C-alpha cells in the first residue's frame, strides 16, 4: 500500500519583519562602510522576499532591548550557548503548534501516532525535539522516535522517505514528521557576502505532516519515490558549522551556478521520463529558483508556489518545502492524480528529490494494488 501525507500543518512565530525594514536595520550597523551598505541593500532587494517571521521580537517594528539587539538598535553577539538556550526555550512550542495543526486537519488522534521523525539544523539538545513532541502532545510512551539533525535545507525529504519506509514495513503505522528551524537565532553583524546573503533570506518556521499507508484514510499526497544525488562540486560552497558566536553559514555565489549545471542530470535520472504536473522547489534563494527554472526549461508558472512561499516566509531551511507542499495540496488548480516533483538542496552539495501524487478522492485498496502492478510491469 502507498504511504500518503494526510495533512500538513504549519506554525510561525508572531513577529513579522518586512524585508525593507530588516534591510535598513542591517545597513545601519556600525561596522558597515558604504560599500557594505550598498551590498546589503542590493542583496536584500534582489531576494524577492516581502516579509519573514522571527522568534526575536526585538527585530520587529516595536524594536526594544533584547538578547540580540540593544536599546540603540545595534546587534549584539551572544555566544552559541545562549543562542542554543533560546532554541531550547522556543523551538518545542513552535513544533507542538505545527504538529497539533497537522493532527487536527487530518482528524487523527494523537494516540494513533506510532512513529515521530523530527528535523532541525538550527539547535540541538537531548532529550530532544522528538522527546518533546511525544511529551507535549501526549503520545504513547512506546512511540518510536527519530531525529534528523544538521542536514540543512534538504532534510524534509529524507524525513518523508523514512516515514514511507516505516509505513511499508508496518502497514498500520501513522508517522508524524516535524521540521522546525529557528534560523534567526544565528544572525550576526558582518560584512561577509556569505553572511549578508544568509541574513537576507533566512527565517523561522515549523511544518508537520501526518503520513499513513491506510488507503481508507482521507485524501492527500501519495509518496511515490525518493532520490538523492551528490554533486561532484560544491562541498566548500554550502556549509553549516558551529562557531563560538552561533552556527556559521557558508553560502557562496557558486551555489546557484552549481545547481544550474547539475540540476538537469539529477532530475532526468530521478524522473526517468515522467513529466510532473507541478513542482515543489526549495527556494534557497531567488537565484536558485531562477537557475532551476532555466536548467529544467520550466514555464514561469511552474514555480509559482515556491516563489510565493519565498515571498511570504523567506527560507525556513528544512521546513520551507513542506510549506510549498501545503500550498499545492490546497491548490484547486492542482487536480486529482496530478504528479508533483519536489527538489531540495543541502550541503555536499546534495540534491534530494521526491515524487508525489495528489489524491482528492480516496483511492481504494483494489485500485492501489492495480497501480502498483502497473508500475512493476
List each model region and its residues:
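Condensing-enzyme catalytic core mediating Claisen C-C bond formation in acyl metabolism
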Residues: 1-86, 174, 183, 189-261, ...
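Short coil/turn connectors at secondary-structure junctions
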Residues: 1-2, 110-114, 141-144, 169-175, ...
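Conserved beta-ketoacyl condensing-enzyme motif
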Residues: 43, 47-138, 274-289
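Short, well-ordered amphipathic alpha-helical segments that serve as non-catalytic structural scaffolds
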Residues: 45, 49, 90-105, 162, ...
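Claisen-condensing/thiolase-fold acyl-transfer catalytic domains that form or cleave C-C bonds
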Residues: 103, 121-123, 135, 140-142, ...
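Active-site-adjacent elements of ketosynthase-type condensing enzymes
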Residues: 125-131, 176-197, 227-243, 286-294, ...
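Active-site glycine-rich loop that binds ribose-phosphate moieties when present
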Residues: 141-143, 148, 158-162, 179-204
Amino acid at each position: 500500500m502507498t504511504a500518503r501525507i494526510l495533512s500538513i500543518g504549519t506554525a510561525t512565530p508572531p513577529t513579522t519583519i518586512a524585508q525593507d525594514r530588516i534591510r535598513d536595520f542591517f545597513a545601519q550597523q556600525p561596522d558597515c562602510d558604504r560599500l557594505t551598505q550598498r551590498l546589503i541593500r542590493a542583496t536584500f532587494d534582489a531576494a524577492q522576499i516581502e516579509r519573514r517571521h522571527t522568534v526575536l521580537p526585538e527585530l520587529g517594528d516595536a524594536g526594544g532591548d533584547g538578547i540580540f539587539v540593544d536599546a540603540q538598535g545595534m546587534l549584539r553577539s551572544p555566544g552559541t550557548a545562549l543562542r542554543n538556550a533560546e532554541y531550547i526555550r522556543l523551538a518545542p512550542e513552535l513544533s507542538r503548534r505545527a504538529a497539533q495543526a497537522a493532527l487536527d486537519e487530518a482528524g487523527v488522534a494523537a494516540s494513533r501516532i506510532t512513529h515521530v521523525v523530527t528535523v532541525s539544523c538550527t539547535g540541538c539538545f537531548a532529550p530532544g525535539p522528538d522527546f518533546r513532541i511525544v511529551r507535549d502532545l501526549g503520545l504513547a510512551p512506546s512511540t518510536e522516535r527519530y531525529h534528523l539533525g544538521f542536514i540543512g535545507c534538504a532534510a524534509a525529504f529524507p524525513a518523508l522517505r523514512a516515514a514511507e519506509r516505516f509505513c511499508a514495513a508496518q502497514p498500520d503505522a501513522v508517522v508524524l514528521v516535524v521540521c522546525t528551524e529557528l534560523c534567526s537565532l544565528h544572525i550576526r553583524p558582518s560584512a561577509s557576502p556569505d553572511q549578508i546573503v544568509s541574513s537576507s533570506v533566512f527565517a523561522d518556521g515549523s511544518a508537520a505532516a501526518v503520513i499513513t499507508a491506510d488507503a481508507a484514510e482521507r485524501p492527500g499526497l501519495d509518496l511515490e519515490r525518493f532520490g538523492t544525488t551528490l554533486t561532484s562540486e560544491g562541498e566548500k560552497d554550502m556549509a553549516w558549522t558551529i562557531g563560538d558566536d552561533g552556527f556559521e553559514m557558508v553560502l557562496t555565489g557558486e551555489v546557484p551556478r552549481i545547481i544550474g549545471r547539475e540540476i538537469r542530470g539529477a532530475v532526468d535520472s530521478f524522473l526517468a521520463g515522467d513529466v510532473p504536473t507541478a513542482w515543489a522547489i526549495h527556494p534557497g534563494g531567488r537565484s536558485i529558483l531562477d537557475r532551476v527554472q532555466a536548467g529544467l526549461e520550466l514555464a514561469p508558472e511552474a514555480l509559482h508556489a515556491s516563489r510565493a512561499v519565498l515571498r511570504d516566509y523567506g527560507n525556513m531551511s528544512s521546513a520551507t518545502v513542506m510549506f510549498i507542499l501545503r500550498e499545492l495540496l490546497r491548490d484547486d488548480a492542482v487536480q486529482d492524480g496530478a504528479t508533483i516533483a519536489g527538489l531540495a538542496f543541502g550541503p555536499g552539495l546534495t540534491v534530494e528529490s521526491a515524487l508525489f501524487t495528489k489524491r482528492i478522492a480516496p483511492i481504494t485498496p483494489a485500485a492501489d494494488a492495480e497501480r502498483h502492478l502497473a508500475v512493476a510491469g
